[in-house]
Swiss-Prot record:
GO cellular component, one term: membrane
Domain LRRNT: 22-54
Species this protein is from: Danio rerio
PANTHER family membership: LEUCINE-RICH REPEAT, IMMUNOGLOBULIN-LIKE DOMAIN AND TRANSMEMBRANE DOMAIN-CONTAINING PROTEIN 2 (PTHR45842:SF14), SYNAPTIC ADHESION-LIKE MOLECULE SALM (PTHR45842)
Region (Disordered): 507-561
Membrane topology summary: Single-pass type I membrane protein
This protein's UniProt keywords: Disulfide bond, Immunoglobulin domain, Leucine-rich repeat, Membrane, Repeat, Signal, Transmembrane, Transmembrane helix
Bias-annotated ranges (Polar residues): 508-523
Localization per Swiss-Prot or TrEMBL: Membrane
Gene3D superfamilies for this protein: Immunoglobulins, Ribonuclease Inhibitor
Gene (name only): lrit2
Protein name as catalogued: Leucine-rich repeat, immunoglobulin-like domain and transmembrane domain-containing protein 2
SMART domains: IG, IGc2, LRR_BAC, LRR_TYP, LRRCT
Annotated Fibronectin type-III domain residues: 364-449
Length: 561
């Protein structure tokens, strides 16, 4: 009898053990003095299994195919204390994925594909002590990343892609404040692992390096020999060996700002920029899309770089102003270099090409503002000429009251031009003419850049309030209004009145069309915005008909860099 009872007990225990160890396919469950656990190693799992027991205290799913932690995936496992998800393919953590895990003390996510972490998710885990994120792809830490991790004793961010960290990340850490103020003496050390990251040791990392140098117990670095990866002059050096200076805005200079060279000669424009961190240099010139010039960059010293723009075989069209701009995160600076071309006879040259035919002397050029940005505007123009494949244009641009304006020569087939880096509250004039002709009525736009605009307006537009067109505009972007110089009344007063009427209409009908069009401008002209003689109307009507015939022609464009 006793043997039968013993046999049944053994069978029962085996069944219970089998059921317990095979709780999920490919996984095993167990119970020890710490509670019940689930272990899944090298399985084909692509997601967290459904129906997890509520009394689990430890979950370990490693070397599987998890790619995401969905919202509230562990919310019903409220007893969970240890969560190991190492060596999976996790790239996304939902901001609410840790919901309900108030008892979680350990989270390990080593060897995944995380580029960022939703740090506010840790508001759900106030008792977290261990956070292991090593061997991921994290490349940035926001200043308040550690705000909801007041009880950490181990933070591992080693072997990620961190290059720059603000010292405020740790200065804003509640644990750092409490330890420094001795509010709660720590029962254990706080271990930080930050090694094996591609640290960029320029002025932006200065505060963090000083913080690392000042660390004292209970804060301990797992590896105190943090190493610079860049820039080249500091690569391989330890943090304690580098002394970083404060960041400064670029200062640009040029040894020569006026260059005159013969037609066909080679010209090299040079500018230097001193900045911390190192500035990025770019050249702005009108014909960038037409001709590819070579830009040679070299380092003068740790803070200074030099750029050389090589113009091979100087053409007449290369004559003009070249701007060297250097910028870093603090701002930008520029210098303008003037290039003139001498003809074989010794006089200044202008774009070559056949002389304007008598019929082209009075060609009507339709010019309009096509785009506006925070930094400038883009204009477009149309003109019907006898030989469009050989027709050159001249852009005249500068402040409205400037005696001499910059001239930029545009080759055949180009019908757009952009200007950037405009000053606020400044009146500018831009004209488009044939070859070297002087601007005439209908070929210019005068515009005033805005000032005192709020942040939303700054994102939407820079140029606003008024655009003065010397003859006629076919389309005007939102926020711009047109007047003509031959109006019989005060143009600015009329534009201001139109602006008030438009704002009133927009407030009354917020879903209405906000884009100014030729139709709306034409209606305004009928009310007296401008008047024309019958002769001018007939001439423009003929030009408009020609333009309409070529409306669908392909027009390559060149953008200002």
């Amino acid at each position: 009898m006793d043997v039968c009872v013993l046999f049944h007990l053994i069978v029962f225990c085996i069944l219970i053990s089998h059921i317990s160890s095979e709780c999920f396919p490919g996984c095993s469950c167990g119970t020890d003095r710490h509670g019940r656990s689930l272990t899944c190693m090298e399985t084909a799992l692509t997601g967290i299994p459904d129906g997890l027991p509520e009394d689990l205290t430890k979950i370990r799913i490693e070397k599987s195919q998890l790619s995401e932690l969905p919202e509230a995936v562990f919310s019903h496992v409220k007893a969970l204390k240890h969560l190991w998800l190492n060596f999976n393919d996790i790239a996304i953590i939902n901001i609410k994925s840790l919901e309900g895990l108030a008892n979680l003390t350990e989270l390990r996510l080593q060897g995944n594909k995380l580029r960022s972490v939703p740090w506010t998710a840790f508001e759900e885990t106030p008792n977290l002590k261990i956070l292991d994120l090593k061997h991921n792809r994290i490349d940035a830490l926001p200043e308040h990343a550690l705000k909801f991790l007041p009880g950490l004793t181990y933070l591992d961010l080693s072997s990620n892609q961190l290059s720059v960290i603000s010292k405020d990340v740790f200065l804003n850490w509640p644990l750092y404040h409490s330890e420094n103020k001795h509010e709660k003496p720590s029962a254990s050390n706080v271990v930080l692992a930050l090694h094996d990251n591609p640290w960029l040791c320029d002025c932006r990392l200065g505060g963090f390096i000083e913080f690392i140098k000042s660390l004292t117990p209970p804060f301990i670095l797992m590896n105190s020999y943090l190493t610079c990866s860049s820039p080249e002059l500091k690569a391989g050096r330890f943090f304690h060996e580098v002394d970083l200076k404060t960041c400064v805005k670029p200062v640009v200079s040029a040894p020569v700002i006026t260059i005159t060279a013969p037609l066909g000669g080679n010209v090299t424009l040079t500018c230097s920029a001193s900045a911390r961190p190192e500035a990025v240099i770019r050249w702005i010139y009108a014909l960038k899309m037409l001709r590819g010039f070579r830009d040679i960059l070299s380092h003068v010293d740790e803070d200074t770089i030099s750029s050389q723009l090589v113009i091979p075989s100087l053409h007449s069209a290369d004559r003009g102003l070249y701007t060297c701009i250097a910028n870093n995160f603090l701002g930008n600076s520029s210098v303008i270099i003037s290039v003139d071309v001498k003809s074989p006879e010794g006089s200044s040259s202008h774009p070559s090409g056949p002389s304007a035919a008598i019929g082209e002397e009075n060609v009507y050029i339709d010019i309009r503002i096509a785009k506006q940005t925070v930094y400038g505007i883009t204009i477009e123009w149309r003109a019907v000429t006898e030989n469009p494949a050989e027709t050159w244009f001249t852009i005249h641009f500068g402040r409205y009251d400037a005696v001499k304006k910059e001239q930029i020569y545009i080759g055949p087939g180009i019908n757009t031009y952009s200007v950037t880096d405009l000053l606020p509250a400044t009146k500018y004039e831009i004209c488009v003419t044939l070859k070297n002709q002087a601007p005439r009525i209908g070929q210019c736009i005068v515009f005033v850049t805005g000032s005192d605009f709020n942040e939303m307006e700054q994102r939407e537009k820079l140029i606003h309030i008024v655009v003065i067109v010397l003859a006629m505009v076919l389309a005007v972007p939102a926020g711009m209004y047109a007047c003509t110089t031959d109006a019989k009344f005060n143009c600015f007063e009329r534009c201001a009145e139109l602006w008030r009427n438009r704002r009133h209409a927009e407030l009354s009908n917020p879903t209405g069309d906000r884009q100014g069009t030729f139709d709306s401008l034409q209606a305004a002209s009928d009310e007296g915005l401008y008047k024309e003689s019958n002769k001018d109307k007939k001439a423009r009507r003929r030009s408009a008909e020609k333009i309409h015939k070529t409306k669908n022609d392909r027009r390559p464009t060149a953008e200002l860099y």
